[in-house]
């Protein structure tokens, strides 16, 4: 199943107030390159839509919240984003994350997070995407993507550890979430992310825009 929809006169699908809209976007600025995906609920969806969406979100949050030994390979991290789906007998065939360049390519190595072995160590100052997804052929697909920065965490007798810090500041649609499927920790990670999004962006917005953002970043 193709992962990227390219509209043509033969394949154009008009948007309707139902189902999901998956938008994978990005741009290059003088400050750097962005890569982001959001899946947005446009109207009524099925229980399957909501379950798949929540599984993808669980994987996304688990990877974003990960702390790991400095120098771990992306292959070692990949299963973190897939484990909730595997328990449901689901999987995705694309990579979980890729390096992001500045002024060059949005897909830029050598580091990657994927099932196939990639031995490049993950170290401080690397940028990488966090983009698990699930695609049901001829039905619908879901992906949620942020760009992350590897930053120092702690140093112990076992060595140096690093963690991820989100660079992407954009609300994640909470409408389709089956909240009971999220652990307390996953809810905390999502709420903390949304609080950061609001605190960073709200000073840049007018009153109407701030109110929209406040609603979109409310805790669940």
Residues of each region from the PLM?
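Active-site neighborhoods and metal-handling regions in enzymes and metal-associated proteins
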Residues: 1-220
């Amino acid at each position: 199943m193709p992962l990227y929809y390219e509209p043509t006169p033969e394949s154009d699908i008009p948007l309707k107030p139902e189902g999901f809209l998956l938008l994978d976007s990005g741009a290059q600025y003088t400050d750097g390159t962005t890569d982001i995906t959001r899946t947005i609920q446009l109207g009524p969806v099925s229980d399957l839509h909501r379950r798949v969406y929540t599984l993808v979100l669980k994987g996304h949050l688990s990877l974003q919240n990960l702390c790991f030994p400095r120098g771990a390979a992306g292959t070692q991290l990949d299963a973190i984003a897939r484990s909730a789906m595997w328990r449901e007998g689901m999987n995705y065939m694309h990579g979980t994350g890729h390096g992001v360049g500045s002024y060059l390519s949005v897909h830029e190595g050598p580091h990657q997070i994927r099932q196939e072995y990639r031995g490049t160590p993950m170290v401080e100052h690397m940028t990488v995407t966090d983009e698990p997804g699930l695609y049901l052929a001829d039905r619908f697909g879901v992906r949620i993507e942020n760009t992350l920065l590897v930053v120092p965490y702690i140093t112990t007798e076992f060595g140096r550890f690093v963690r991820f810090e989100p660079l992407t500041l954009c609300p994640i649609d909470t409408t389709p979430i089956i909240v009971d499927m999220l652990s307390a920790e996953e809810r905390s990670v999502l709420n903390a992310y949304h609080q950061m999004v609001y605190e960073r962006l709200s000073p840049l917005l007018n009153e109407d825009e701030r109110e929209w953002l406040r609603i979109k970043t409310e805790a669940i």
